[in-house]
C-alpha cells in the first residue's frame, strides 16, 4: 500500500466548521502513542524510513514506512500489521534496535468521500491537519496528490503550506 499524505499546520477551530459544512463524517478518535526505532546498521533518519510501534486503545500496530516518493507531499510505501506491542519492543531491544523517540497525539478522524482527514493535536507541538488517500498502484500517485491539494484549497490551504517534516523530527528538534 502507498500512503499519499499531505500534512499542514492548522487551527482545528477553523477546520471543523468547514468539515461539517461539506458533510464529512467523523469516524473515530484515537489517543496514539508512537515509539520509533533506530536500527543498529542503518540510520532511518538518513534513509527516510520509519519503524514504529503505535499503541492506541489497548492494542498495538507495527509500521514500516519507506522513503518519501516526491518533493511536495509525504507519499510513501506503508506496511502495517497488528502486534503485541510489549513483545515486539522486547524483540527489537534484544536485536539492538534503540528507541529513536516518541510522539503522542490525539487524532480526530473524519472521512470526506475517499479522503481520510485527521485533526492531530500533538503533545508539545500543537495542532495539525493531515489528509490521506491510500493507493495500490504507483500510477495513481499524481492524481491522488492533486485530489488532496484540491481538497485542501477549500480550507484556503495550498502546496506551499505542505510540511514534509515528521512529527518525530519536530519532537527531536524541540528537544535539542
Ligand atoms: P501516520 O501518518 O502513519 O499516522 P504520523 O502522522 O503520526 O504517522 P508522520 O510524521 O506522518 O507521523 O510520520 C512519521 C515519520 O517519522 C516518518 O516520516 C519517518 O520518516 C519519521 N522517522 C522515523 N524514524 C525516524 C528517525 N530515526 N529520525 C527521523 N525521523 C524518523
Ligand atoms: Ca498517514
Ligand atoms: Ca502522517
Segment roles from a protein language model:
Residues 1-114, 155-176:
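N-terminal strand-loop-strand beta-hairpin
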Residues 65, 122-132:
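Residues forming anionic-ligand binding surfaces in small-molecule and nucleic-acid pockets
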Residues 87, 105, 126, 143-150:
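Residues forming well-ordered secondary-structure scaffolds
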Residues 117-120:
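Short beta-strand/turn micro-motifs at beta-sheet edges
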Residues 134-139:
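A generic structural motif
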Residues 140-163:
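Mixed-charge, glycine-accented linear interaction segment located at domain edges/termini
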Amino acid at each position: 500500500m502507498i500512503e499519499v499524505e499531505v500534512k499542514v499546520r492548522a487551527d482545528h477551530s477553523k477546520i471543523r466548521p468547514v468539515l461539517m459544512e461539506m458533510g464529512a463524517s467523523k469516524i473515530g478518535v484515537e489517543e496514539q502513542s508512537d515509539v520509533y526505532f533506530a536500527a543498529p546498521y542503518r540510520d532511518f533518519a538518513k534513509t527516510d524510513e520509519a519503524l514504529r510501534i503505535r499503541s492506541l486503545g489497548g492494542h498495538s500496530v507495527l509500521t514500516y514506512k519507506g522513503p518519501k516518493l516526491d518533493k511536495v507531499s509525504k507519499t510513501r510505501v506503508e506496511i502495517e500489521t497488528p502486534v503485541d506491542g510489549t513483545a515486539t519492543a522486547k524483540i527489537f531491544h534484544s536485536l539492538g534496535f534503540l528507541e529513536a523517540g516518541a510522539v503522542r497525539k490525539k487524532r480526530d478522524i473524519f472521512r470526506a468521500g475517499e479522503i481520510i482527514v485527521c485533526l492531530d493535536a500533538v503533545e508539545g507541538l500543537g495542532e495539525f491537519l493531515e489528509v490521506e488517500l491510500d493507493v495500490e498502484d504507483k500510477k495513481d500517485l499524481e492524481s491522488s496528490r492533486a485530489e488532496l491539494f484540491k481538497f485542501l484549497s477549500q480550507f484556503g490551504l495550498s502546496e506551499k503550506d505542505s510540511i514534509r517534516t515528521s512529527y518525530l523530527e519536530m519532537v527531536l528538534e524541540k528537544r535539542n
